């Protein structure tokens, strides 16, 4: 039976560490860390995600500054809102909730966020910092995956890793983080010929393709660690990932569940980025380097 890579339990542990840092320094600084989540439109899933992030902020002592704009808000008004948040001294982290309504281009809006307040780690400057191994906010989902691996004693150094998916949100930064941890990395995608031939050679498989049930028993070698980033709602109810868990669990040495694996750590890394930005701004020694390296 595969080791369960329990993101929910790890997220609770990390939240306790963040609470300790915030409690220790908020009075001296004069204000808590602040996270602003900008939501455009009325996507129901986005509303739930934002509410969950606000609850997580409250648990660790981060102040939430939500901004909600109508779906038909023009791009220049969204940009103006971002610029206001950039200038707001209460705000240490800014998140633009994706996806955006049709007609809004996310890239220039993400680029408008102050790189030092980029809580999602998606600004070009921060992706460049990741590439160069320099400190800066890290993309939340890949950083959460790395924390899950490390906390369960899975060291990527010298290991063969396959990342399925090449999005700027997960796949590309995931590959960079694994390379920085001295893994030998292959990036696969929907057009990769004979995907199983690649994944069966891997010690670590990270699946972020956005396709339910894409990876099954035939894709995994015995003893591999498999991280399932996908999350999908099944027609009959309930959730599933990109991995057929019941097939892979008897084969793999470790497997992240859906839900309860990567998802909780994605939210927690958003909090980590915000607290670290607050600490850097105020010259605080945060002792969170193991989560952002």
From Swiss-Prot:
The keyword Amino-acid biosynthesis applies. It catalyses: (6R)-5,10-methylene-5,6,7,8-tetrahydrofolate + NADP(+) = (6R)-5,10-methenyltetrahydrofolate + NADPH; (6R)-5,10-methenyltetrahydrofolate + H2O = (6R)-10-formyltetrahydrofolate + H(+). Pathway: One-carbon metabolism; tetrahydrofolate interconversion. It comes from the Bacteria. NADP(+) binds at residues 165-167, 190, 231. GO terms for molecular function: methenyltetrahydrofolate cyclohydrolase activity; methylenetetrahydrofolate dehydrogenase (NADP+) activity. SUPFAM superfamilies: Aminoacid dehydrogenase-like, N-terminal domain (SSF53223), NAD(P)-binding Rossmann-fold domains (SSF51735). Its EC number is 1.5.1.5, 3.5.4.9. GO terms for biological process: L-histidine biosynthetic process; methionine biosynthetic process; purine nucleotide biosynthetic process; tetrahydrofolate interconversion. Keywords: Amino-acid biosynthesis, Histidine biosynthesis, Hydrolase, Methionine biosynthesis, Multifunctional enzyme, NADP, One-carbon metabolism, Oxidoreductase, Purine biosynthesis. One of its GO terms (cellular component) is cytosol. NCBIfam families: PRK14186.1. PANTHER family: C-1-TETRAHYDROFOLATE SYNTHASE, CYTOPLASMIC (PTHR48099:SF5), C-1-TETRAHYDROFOLATE SYNTHASE, CYTOPLASMIC-RELATED (PTHR48099). Catalyzes the oxidation of 5,10-methylenetetrahydrofolate to 5,10-methenyltetrahydrofolate and then the hydrolysis of 5,10-methenyltetrahydrofolate to 10-formyltetrahydrofolate. Homodimer. Belongs to the tetrahydrofolate dehydrogenase/cyclohydrolase family. This is Bifunctional protein FolD. The lineage of its organism: Bacteria, Bacillati, Cyanobacteriota, Cyanophyceae, Synechococcales. The gene is folD.
